Amino acid sequence: MVRAADGMMAFYPVVENRHHQGILDFSVVPARCAESLQNQARRCAARIADALDYVGVLAVEFFVDGAGRLLVSEMAPRPHNSGHFTIDACVHSQFDQQVRALCGLPLGETRLLSPVVMMNLLGDLWENDEPDWSTLLRHPQLKLHLYGKKVARPGRKMGHVNVLAPDIRQAMAVLDALRGDGHRPREAGMGFPDAEHSAGCGPSCKPLRQSQ
């Protein structure tokens, strides 16, 4: 979400985040959860922003417990990793909104232009050498963003990809093709590990690594 100095707010679609070992693995937008939960999350974030008289982009993360209740996990008073999907999939990105809010400009439109899955690229991919980006970029629905970091370390966020598709199922299929799902060969040169599944409404995946 983003809040202006005059109290006006704009909300991006609720994001479904999947983590591995405490690091964001991928985000699914729109989230695959009940609309009632999404409305509750927006109301809670709005109350927090108003109480703090906050100006700018604010990310509020929640857990959903076994009873279906929302529990606030953390707040990030800045553009956030889980908002990187907005660069390609929304009318205005979270970075546009940060500038607009801080400069007193009207807040931009947050409308989602396409369903999208954002996946982090971790330093594990650089274990042996620079990844073969030409293999990854064979997918026309995919947009690659690298951060220009010189040193790659396991778990360090080196970039991300946004996969846009007519629906989430198709976007996840591209993600599965990149990772290899254990039922077909992995993409040559990328070394994405097999997908694993956990309890919840969507898949959870192992950390990325470069193939041997």
Predicted regions and their residues:
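Internal nucleotide-binding/catalytic subdomain
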Residues: 1-60, 64-66
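Short, acidic Gly/Pro/Ser/Thr-rich loop/turn segments
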Residues: 7-10, 19-21, 80, 126, ...
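A general structural signal for well-ordered alpha-helical segments in protein cores
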Residues: 11, 42, 95, 155-158
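Generic beta-structure capping elements
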Residues: 14-17, 75-78, 147
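Short, flexible active-site loops
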Residues: 22-32, 74-87
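Active-site "cap" helix and flanking loop/linker of ATP-utilizing ligase/carboxylase catalytic domains
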Residues: 39-60, 66, 76-125, 130
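Conserved protein kinase catalytic/activation segment
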Residues: 68-70
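Peripheral (often C-terminal) accessory segments that flank ATP-dependent C-N-forming ligase machineries
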Residues: 100-212
